[in-house]
Amino acid sequence: MLGRIRLFLFKIKKSINMNFELTEEQLAVKEAARDFAQNVLKPGVIDRDNNQRFPVEEIKQLAELGFMGMMVDPKYGGSGMDTMSYVLAMEEISKVDASASVCMSVNNSLVCWGIEKYGSEEQKQKFLVPLATGEKIGAFCLSEPEAGSDATSQSTTAIDMGDYYLLNGTKNWITNGSSASTYLVIAQTNVELGHKGINALIIERGMEGFIVGAKEDKMGIRGSDTHTLLFNDVKVPKANRIGEDGFGFTFAMKVLSGGRIGIAAQALGIAAGGFELALAYSKQRKAFGKEIYKHQAIA
């Protein structure tokens, strides 16, 4: 019986043709990301974090590498890479600078992916291209003061005024809050319809009534600009709505599902970077006559 089971498992493995080795392209992306993290991000990362300084120039260089629109079709200015390449790049960047990687993650996983997957051709040409090339940075606006990231409990409203929506409300804890130029905002259009009355709108910096509010003084990832956003009678053209009327909730759920891949890769990178630093320190620090890594509690 055991032999039959082994033979069965062998046949399954052979038929699936499992291959967990990285391709040459993926290895090249990983190496490029590692080199960039070590040589460009690492020298100033402590200063940026201490002073809450957004890595403006560093993000521009990330864009030059094609890392701000990694999975976007080249016809829209992206790099056309696969998800694994994106994950590998996120890990390497996050090992050194989580502030740079979270900006990269939001732009790739949430904003670029959301517009490419569900936006109109006009929206892709107008908004996706500059986001994928890194000319502009995007932000995803869902969380609210009294609702957190519960997409079904939106207090921000987008009232249908015929040719446009009138947007009012507040969004909190928005990554890339002050550095972004393009914002995906989730808002309630029809309260009676519940989650089926929610829309996703593309907001541009400079729209009248749109204000970037207070910056959060965070414990970590301080180089990332996390802000409150205020919308006071902002007129949003109907052309800026993503998908059909009432598609906003589904859009948010789909986009967040993809976004979890980037954030998981970031968490893995942060953990790996922390381990590498701790290991190096344990070989330098001495206590009781020997390096601390030789003590049982650490070894």
Residue locations for each model-derived region?
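Glycine-rich beta->alpha junctions and the first turn(s) of the following alpha-helix
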Residues: 19-29, 91, 95, 210-299
